[in-house]
Amino acid sequence: MHDIGYSIDEDSHNKYSQKLILKEGLSDFSEKETEIISCICRYHRGDLPDKKEDKLYKDFDKDEKRTVKRLGGILRIADGLEDDEIGEIKDIKIDYNEEDYITEISIYTKEEITPDIKTIIRKKNLFEYGFRTQVVLKFRKLK
């Protein structure tokens, strides 16, 4: 659902995904849930949520904003992992260090890869913002 905006514009598909969801609605969800889902799709790439620029996000309460940041952050990382350069992912392990607020995400692939570091850094920022943690992504070849 987060990529439905591709049908209108590839570069801004995240913004168009949000607009389409808001315009058409989601039959199994309330209006508020639909707004939250639209924002999750909006922020799966690009800028971080901005209370000043995004009127819809600005009007959410604290819990709704946290939901957008957290689920959007998870979606953003997952979206980055579907990159052709990474290939088929065989396993993912997530460890959280409460003492240091570090989340280590180990991604296991069949082949050894060297992902684009700039892309990885961009993809983890919303997760870090939403969960108040530092993310360390590790790519490992499955043994």
Name the predicted role of every residue range.
Residues 1-94:
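Divalent metal-dependent catalytic cores for phosphoryl transfer on phosphate-bearing substrates
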Residues 81-84, 127-130, 134:
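Hydrophobic alpha-helical segments
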Residues 94, 105-107, 135-137:
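Hydrophobic beta-strand residues in large extracellular and virion-surface proteins
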Residues 98-103, 129-131:
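Short flexible coil/turn linkers enriched for glycine and charged/polar residues
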Residues 104-118:
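A short interface-forming secondary-structure element
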Residues 109-112, 123, 139:
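C-terminal accessory subdomains of helicases
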Residues 115-130:
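Extended Gly/Ser/Thr-rich low-complexity repeat segments
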Residues 131-143:
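A short amphipathic beta-strand at an alpha->beta junction
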